[in-house]
Amino acid sequence: MKAPVVRPSLTRFAAAFAGGAVLLATACSPDPAGWNPGDGDETVGLMTPVLLNAGTTAIYSGDYFLEPEEVDSVVWPDGLRAEYKADSAVYRVTGALKKPLDVAHFWMAGASFDLVLYANGAQYRTFTYPRQPGDTAWAEDAVRIIGTFNAWNRSATALKRGDSTWTVDVPLFPGNHEYKFVVNGVELLDPSNSRAVPNGIGGVNNTLEVKREGLPARPLKTRSVDESGSQITLAPLPKNQKLVVLWENHALPADAVVQTENSIRIQLPDEAADLPRSFVRIYSANAHRRSNDLLIPLEKGRVLLQGDLLQRHDWEAATLYFLMVDRFANGDPSNDRPLNRPDVLPQADFQGGDLDGVTWAIQRGFFEKLGFNTVWLSPIARNPQGAWGLWDKTVPNTKFSAYHGYWPASNTQPDARFGRPDQVRNTLASAHSRNLNVLLDYVGNHVHEEHPVYRAKPQWFNSLYLPDSSLNTEKWDEYRLTTWFDTFLPDVNTENPEAVAALTDSALVWVRDYGFDGYRHDATKHVANLYWRTLTQKLKHQVAAPRGQRLYQIGETYGSPELIASYLGSGLMDAQFDFNLYDAALGFCANLNTDATRLKEVLDASLAAYGHHHLMGNISGNQDKPRFISLANGDVRLDEDTKAAGYTRKIGTPGASAYQKLAMMHAFNFSIPGIPVVYYGDEYGMPGANDPDNRRLMKFKNYTPEEDKLRKEVAKLAQFRTKSPVLAYGSTTVKALSKNVVLIERSYFGERVLTILNRSNQPVKFTVKQLQLHPKTR
C-alpha cells in the first residue's frame, strides 16, 4: 500500500513572536490520498493520546520525536490553536475540540505523524458548606474540601465565604467522587449530602456522582482476520461515530478503512511486514463519549494470534514478580554485614539476601516455573552504614539499617552487601538468557545525607525548613515536590535543571551500562516532570533508539487518577501502580466493605483514565502495606496502626478461607488489563502486618498444603497470562452480577476468556446461554 508522497495543502504562518513563539495554522487537513509513514527512525514507541486541559495544554514535541526541530508543520483539529516555543519545542494548545476525540497531524520530511487528542470532559460542580455562628473570625481559607479529585490534599481547594454559605466550584470528570470538608483542620461530612461510602479505615466519605453526557458510544469489537493475516474485520459502528485507525504513529488512509452497515474492514500496510513487531491502534467516539480503544499487535505485518509469538518486551503480556533483595535468598554469605546492634531489632537489620541469591533462583527456574517473565528488584545502589531513623510508638523501640535500599548514598555504585558490579551483570545475564526482564527499583526523589552530591552541591536540594521555620517532613500533599521523607534524607530539587541533568545521567547508568530492562521509580509524585521528561529522553536517545529495545518505566503515586495520569505519556512514565484499584479489589476479595458494583466502578474508572490497554501495575501487595492474607483473615485491621501491629503481636498463619480470598485477588489481577504484580511470598500466602513485618524472609520449601495449593494456582494463572493474546490485548467488559459476584470478559478475534469471581459462601450457577458460550467452550 505504498503511495506517492502528497503534501497537505496548508496555510503557514511564519511570523515570529517574543520568546521564539510561532502561531501555527489550525484548520486545514492532509490529503487522505497521500500516505507516507516515514523512515521509522523519527519516533520511539507509540505516541500516546493527550487529554487536553480545560485551559492551556503543553505538548512537548520532544516527547514524541527524537529530533523535534525537524517537524516542519502541524495541522491541529478544528477548534484548537497552538503557539510554538522553539527554545523548548513546546506547543501551547488552547481552544476546545468539537468532538470527544480528534487527531493532530505532525509533518516531517513528507511524512505525517498523527497524535490522538481527547477533549476535556470535566464538568463543574458547586460545593457549599453552611455558615457557622462566629465564623467571621475564621481565616479566609478555614473551610476546605478534600477528595479523590485533589488527592486528598488539604491545601489544594479552599471555599470562599459568602452571605450564607462557603462555596467553591470544582471541575470533576464523570464518575463517582469521594470527598469531605475540612473545617479549621477537622474533617467533617457534607451536611447536605447523605450519600456516603466506607473509607477503609473505619469511617466514611461522602460520595458524588457526575453523570456522563449523552449516550454511550458503541464499543469497538474485533471479529476476524483473513487468511493472509493482513486484513482485520471489526463489528460495525453507527454512521455518526468517528473512527481513527493508526498503524504505529500514522493514520491509515481512507481507502484502507472500509465501513459498511455490517462490518469495518482494515487493510494493513505493506510496510508492517518490515517490522518484527508493530501495532494497530483504533479509537472511536460519538458526539458525546469515547468508546473503548483497541491495541492489535502485528508479527511482521500479520496479526499476532499465537501466544508463543509473544516476547519478553511485549510488556502487555508481562507478569511481574517483586522481591526485596535482602529478604529473598542468601547466595553469597561472604558479603553478610548485619549491624547486630542492640538498638536495631532483627527485623530492621540486614538478613543476608543478595544478588547471588537472585541469580540462584533464576538458574533453578524459580520464576519460570511460577510463570513470571519479569523480576523487579528492590534498590541495590550503595546505602549508608549504621542505623538511622527511630520507631518509638511501641516497646521496644528500634532504629533501622538500610537493608531495604531506599536511602541512596550513591546513585551509580551497587551496595557491597548486595553484590559487586560483576555480580549485578551476572544476575542480568542469567535472567536474559532465560528470557526474563529485570526492572530496577530506583530512587530519584532523595538521597541520604552521606551522599557525596549532597555535600558537594547542597544548592541542588530543597530546604528542610518551611518559611515559618517548621520542618518540611512527610508533608506528602501540601508540599509534594519539596517535602523530605526524614531529616536525614535530603530532597532533590527536581525543578533545578542543573541537578536534573546530572542526576538523570546517574540513573541512566543502570539501563545503559548494566542492561536493566527498565525501572520501578520510587516516590514518583514527589518528583517534578522535568526529571522524568529528561530521563526518558535520554533513555530514548541512548538506549531505546540505538538498540531497538522497548523499555518499561513504572512509577509509584498515591492519589487521584488525574494525578497518577499526569505522570504518564510518551515522554514520561509508561505506567504507575493502580493503588485505587488495589484498594477496591482488596475490599471486595477480602470482603472488607466493598461490593461488586463498587469494584466495577473503580475498574471502569481506571480504564477511562489510563486507556483500555494500559500497562498499569495491578498489585497483590507491596513493601508498604500489610500482607493481603493477614487483612483477609482479620489478623490485621485497616482501622489500626498496621505497623504497630507487627511490633506488638505475632501475625500468624491464616485460616483456609484467607487463602481462597488471596487466590481470588490474584485471579482478578491476572484477568484485567495491565501488568499483574505479585509481591514475594504472596504466591503462597506469606502473612504479616505492615513494614517491617511484611518483609519477612522468603521460603522456598516446606509449604503447608494451603500454601502449596495457592502457589500452584498462581503458577497456572501466570503461565496462562504470559501466553495469552486475549488477556494481553483483548477488549474488556466488566459486570457486577450481584453484590458478591463480578464477571470479567476479555475478547480478541473470536476468542473469549471469562473470569467469574464469587466471594460469597454460596455457589452461583450459570447456563451456557446466560454466558453466551459456545457449546464446546473449555
Which stretches of residues belong to each language-model region?
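Solvent-exposed, low-complexity, repeat-rich "mucin-like" stalks and linkers
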Residues: 36-75, 221-239
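C-terminal motif of bacterial Sec signal peptides marking the signal peptidase cleavage site
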Residues: 24-27
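Loop/helix patches that line or flank the sugar-binding groove of alpha-linked glycan CAZymes
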Residues: 315, 331-350, 600-601, 607-774
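Active-site-proximal helices and loops of the catalytic beta/alpha 8
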Residues: 37-39, 44-47, 436, 446, ...
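Bacterial signal peptide processing site
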Residues: 29-31
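Substrate-binding/active-site clefts of carbohydrate-active enzymes
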Residues: 318, 328-514, 534-546, 562-564
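Aromatic-rich carbohydrate-binding modules that target alpha-glucans
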Residues: 116-176, 184-211, 244-264
